[in-house]
Amino acid sequence: MMELLWTPEAVRDREDIYDYIEEDNPLAALAIDDLIAERTAVLQDFPRMGRGGRVPDTFELVVHSSYMVVYDIVETQVRILNIVHTARQWPPLEE
């Protein structure tokens, strides 16, 4: 079993998603957060479950029709890098 590590950026993304949804529907915010937790936990046993990412050396896992988790694998760790809304440009355009 791989270790699951959340980067500070991914934690911030998750909190932002929760806060945004909670404004209109607290129960939906809990449901989405639980879904993100459940789907990412599966990566501990199946780390290559996601498709190859658009950023080199990453993977992408759609956890909900609106959200995708970007992660990489480093030795015995699955590192959650970002959670991205599927309607957003990913990777972001460089300025």
What are these regions (language model features)?
Residues 1-58, 74, 93-95:
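Basic, Lys/Arg-enriched alpha-helical interface segments
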Residues 67-68, 72-95:
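Enriched for short, Lys/Arg-rich terminal
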